[in-house]
Amino acid sequence: MEKVFSLFFVLLIVGCAQNEPLYDYDIEKKINEMGLKVPEPSTPIANYVPAVSFSESGKTKLVYVSGTGPKTKEGTYITGKVDQDLTIEEGYGAARLTALNILGSLKGEIGDLNKVVRFVKVIGMVNSTPNFNQQPAVINGFSDFIVEVFGDRGRHARSAVGLVSLPSDIAVEIEVVVEVLN
């Protein structure tokens, strides 16, 4: 009886130690089915890294992704001020593209986007004219894309702010904090 109990206990521990999948679909496959591809992480233009992980141990950790912009697959950036050089819809598209670039940095840090437990915090910065007040409508491009890909795990706390300039005149810059499996 003691051997049976020991075997049961070992099987219970092994069974509990395995992580259940978070999604009933593959995140990257879903992105590919949308006609998109997760890019490689961008090379930083200064003395920083694209993403940093933080964990005090446990099942999950936080990943902080550096400010990222709307880099196209051709390697250029969408630039200009929303409400002057770009429409709200074009800014929305730039934020959506930035979401894809952020996933590239995130994948570079964690290896597998299926490890994403949830998006925690998003800070969206919009290069806009001083009187423009529709920054949330622009950053919705990011939020809508992330929720489309990750479902409810993509819902996040968010700030959307306007700035009179961004580095290299990019249209948007977005930072995120993401909880992932360790």
Annotate the PLM regions.
Residues V4-I13:
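Sec-dependent N-terminal signal peptides
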Residues C16-L100, G104-V120, S128-N182:
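N-terminal presequence-like segments and the immediate start of the first folded domain
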